[in-house]
Amino acid sequence: MKGGTMVENAQYLDASASAPGSTTPLETAWIRVREKLKSEVGEVEYRTWLRQIVLGPLEEDELTLYLPTRFLRDWVRSQYEERLQTLWRTEREDIKGVELQVKRGLPEVSMGDAEDGEDGSGEGHELATQAAAPESRSDLAVPLDPRFTFDTFIVGKPNEFAYACARRVAEKPSSPGFNPLFLYGGVGLGKTHLMHAIGTELTRTGKVSVAYMSAEKFMYRFIAAIRSQSTMEFKEQLRSVDVLMIDDLQFLIGKDNTQEEFFHTFNALVDAGRQIIVSADKSPSDLSGLEDRLRTRLGCGMVADIHATTFELRISILEAKAKASGTHVPSKVLEYLAHKITTNVRELEGALNRLIAHADLVGRPVTLDTTQDVLKDMLKAHDRRVTIEEIQRKVSEHWNIRLTDMSSARRARAVARPRQVAMYLAKQLTSRSLPEIGRKFGNRDHTTVMHAVNRVTELMDQDTSFAEDVELLRRMLEG
């Protein structure tokens, strides 16, 4: 009993064993789940990754399955957990969830290079005698995404250098000074897009062989080759390509054996005049945890940084996506999204896609109100205070004036009107007094601030377009 709840069958059943003479209902269901898994993924994949799962207890409505190492647990969780959940719920209505856990001391079918010192598997265990068959080259790499081309990549100041470098490599692979090409920047800024674009461009003629994969997949393929005693075939497959692209290299930090293999693959390809393209979240010199010799080699070619997007670039990306969709999205909605989602282009595009899908499904146009409603989970307000500095920055961006104009003595309407709006929003959205607000705007008198507030209020009543601009800014600042 646990907490007054019956625990069903805590006896463990090895996933590779046949059913004993007398089995419990849970064990019988597990046998059926295993057989379905095996038929879905194939014998080779089943023996490679799923054979070592061990049945654990069913407590309340949650079933526990055990694996011998953390590496195996993480891999099964990322690749098969959803399917395991579905199969178990189909077999047993009383099972609502499946939890994968590591249990030390279970029989381990040779994990080889598990790349994880914490799970007890270490690196260099005895290789399995029953293991996966070697993979063909088509299985080794990931297919290129046809959506990611140079034509669909929106260029702006933050990414123009990386784009130019990618273009050069696509036109003349292995050019002096461009091998390797190392692209780095934050998540969702376009590194993967550029890599796929290079690959797509190079493979159009059919004369260049390209292999693209994530660093994580490189490691898993390497481990599978060790376990299947086919490392030579793995090496030959990778070293026979004309262009090798490895995405998210930072994944190899701390994976010493895989780093070693990648280093030798890197040298073999470059020495043979083949092109290497790598991406990471940091520059080679900042990837602490990678071997020094590998960092040095990565930095000896062309290193291109993709900077965070600007407001103008985000607008361009959204406009292009909206146009391609065929759905009308008001410019004020695009501006709102560009102001709100500033760090991740992937998330920005995802937000727009969700809006467009919603408009298509419900048959209603996209508006600011529907945008806030549909995307409330993405745009929910953070627990923070709006500052006058933030208001000044947002208003300056919106009307394309210099931030210094907020505190300058310039009286031209193109400057004075945005300054008045910023004062109005400072009064509405902060707890600062009028004199405090005035000091933030070039030491202006409190009466000047009051005049600005009254003037903006009047204009909002008279000019619908102006009122919409102010309302857009208020919504962006409030969250």
Curated annotation (Swiss-Prot):
Entry keywords, A to Z: ATP-binding, Cytoplasm, DNA replication, DNA-binding, Lipid-binding, Nucleotide-binding
GO annotation (BP), single: DNA replication initiation
Stretch list, region Domain I, interacts with DnaA modulators: 1-94
Region (Domain IV, binds dsDNA) residue spans: 360-479
Region named Domain III, AAA+ region: 143-359
Subcellular location(s) per record: Cytoplasm
Binding of ATP, residues: 188, 190-192
Gene Ontology CC entries for this record: cytoplasm; plasma membrane
Cited SUPFAM superfamilies: P-loop containing nucleoside triphosphate hydrolases, TrpR-like
Location of the region described as Domain II in the Swiss-Prot/TrEMBL record: 94-142
InterPro entries: AAA+_ATPase, Chromosome_initiator_DnaA, Chromosome_initiator_DnaA-like, Chromosome_initiator_DnaA_CS, DnaA_C, DnaA_dom, DnaA_N_dom, DnaA_N_sf
Residue pairs linked by disulfide bridges in the UniProt entry: none
Molecular function terms, GO-annotated: ATP binding; ATP hydrolysis activity; DNA replication origin binding; lipid binding
Keyword field contains Lyase: no
Similarity annotation: Belongs to the DnaA family.
Matching PANTHER family: CHROMOSOMAL REPLICATION INITIATOR PROTEIN DNAA
Protein known as: Chromosomal replication initiator protein DnaA
Lineage: Bacteria, Pseudomonadati, Pseudomonadota, Alphaproteobacteria, Acetobacterales
The gene coding this protein: dnaA
